[in-house]
Amino acid sequence: MALYEHVYLARQDISAQQVEALTEQLKSVIESFQGKVTKVEYWGVKSLAYRIKKNRKAHFSLLNIEAPAAALTEMERQMGINEDVLRFMTLRVEEHEQGPSAMMRKRDDDDRGERGERPRGPRPERGERGERGERGPRRPREDNIGEEGLY
């Protein structure tokens, strides 16, 4: 059986429990075709880069799947019908990533808290540069710019 990573976005106005129920429904579809879901990650509600079906935020979830192609076809068909699913993407992979995904590692890094000021190192004072001096007269302004069609 082939290995897949499947990410889907669910509407922001449904609860986390409803997202879990949707994930369980997808798992049951995969298992009905003798496949298995090896890992499930809920990434939380995140802002979208642009509006999708009038939503600015969405619940993000990742599934690592080991299943035949027919199982994926049926799962994607059901996701297309479900109004709570905004987008989904399934990628075939050679092997599943061990441990937490990159998104979960990034979220853990964000939870480190305030780190305080960082050392800046030695820097010259701004006053050491000296005066700029006179800039000189400006060149005369051309009044015929509009006549040339530049503006």
Curated annotation (Swiss-Prot):
For molecular function, the Gene Ontology terms on record are: small ribosomal subunit rRNA binding; structural constituent of ribosome
Question: In its UniProt record, which GO terms are filed under biological process?
Answer: translation
Domain of life of the source: Bacteria
Pfam families tied to this protein: Ribosomal_S6 (PF01250)
**InterPro entries cross-referenced by the UniProt entry:** Ribosomal_bS6, Ribosomal_bS6_sf, Ribosomal_S6_plastid/chlpt, Transl_elong_EF1B/ribsomal_bS6
> What's a single GO CC term here?
cytosolic small ribosomal subunit
Q: Region (Disordered) spans which residues?
A: 94-151
Q: Which Gene3D superfamilies match?
A: 3.30.70.60
Which keywords does this Swiss-Prot/TrEMBL entry list? Ribonucleoprotein, Ribosomal protein, RNA-binding, rRNA-binding
**Cited CDD domains:** bS6 (cd00473)
Which residue stretches does the UniProt record annotate as biased composition, category Basic and acidic residues?
105-144
Question: Could you confirm whether the keyword Repressor appears in this record?
Answer: no
Q: Which HAMAP family match?
A: Ribosomal_bS6
Q: What is the purpose of this protein?
A: Binds together with bS18 to 16S ribosomal RNA.
Per the similarity annotation, which family is this?
Answer: Belongs to the bacterial ribosomal protein bS6 family.
UniProt name for this protein? Small ribosomal subunit protein bS6
